[in-house]
Amino acid sequence: RFIMHDLTPKQKRQARITALQVIYALELQGSNMDATFEHMLDTKDQSENDVFKYSRHLCALTSQNIDEIDELIKKRSKNWDFERITIMDRLILRLSLVEMMFEDSVPPKVSITEGVEIAKQFSTSDSSSFINGIMDAVYNDLVKGKEKAA
């Protein structure tokens, strides 16, 4: 498990954005995750190593859990054909949901807020509310249910 308590909120945001860039490249080019990270390391300040470690961790979690995450998105995107959701929105949802569900060091509400903020920066004007709706539905259905069961 990755420990990210040493990262500042700004570094965590950068890690999420870097992870988004990597999975975007993988989605469009089918390139290798390791090669994509190596290329990014060559072009970024090496002092960001912890940022890259967390980015790599998020990408790996996304890759390992993509089928489960996509099913969650499909079930909660009423009246939307999954394939018609913009690529960027799908990728932001995948990353944010993976972090919310599988990264215990991040409170679920932070994952939701980060997904919404990243959508405002990288996607369409309607994306942030769409992403917020899906994330909130998953949180209410699954995460809160886990907390009550515990």
Show where each model-derived region lies:
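N-terminal interaction/assembly modules
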Residues: 1-128, 132-150
